[in-house]
Amino acid sequence: MPSPTTRHLVLTFGFAVAALPAVAADGKAVYDKTCVACHASGVANAPKLGDKAAWAPRVATGKDALFGAVVKGKGAMPPKAGAADLKDDDIMAAIDYMLTAAK
């Protein structure tokens, strides 16, 4: 039988874990669900995933500028890529995934 101290630690740890914010979605999962339709083929001038030359000028603007472009929309891309329920953490995860592929 666990000691009262052990039970207290387990309960405390359990509450601490439950209080953590939800982990942002995997960037690839967000890309596959929301971004792939345009960024896989380059539709409407969208830079293709992994195309270093196409991504270079966007990389130069920085992640904050890319985030703003996704949130507000840019060119043919609607705000939040048409996924109004997309969370900021998910957007950043997708940006990180696409930038990593462009290196």
Can you describe what each PLM-predicted range is?
Residues 25-34:
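Local sequence-structure signature of Cys/Sec-based thiol-disulfide redox active-site neighborhoods
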Residues 35-41, 94:
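The canonical Cys-X-X-Cys-His
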Residues 11-12, 22:
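Cleavable N-terminal signal peptides
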Residues 18-25:
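Sec/Tat signal peptide C-region and signal peptidase I cleavage site
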Residues 4, 41-56:
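His/Cys-centered metal/cofactor-coordination and adjacent catalytic loops
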Residues 47-48, 56, 68-93, 98-102:
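Axial heme c-ligation environment in periplasmic c-type cytochrome domains
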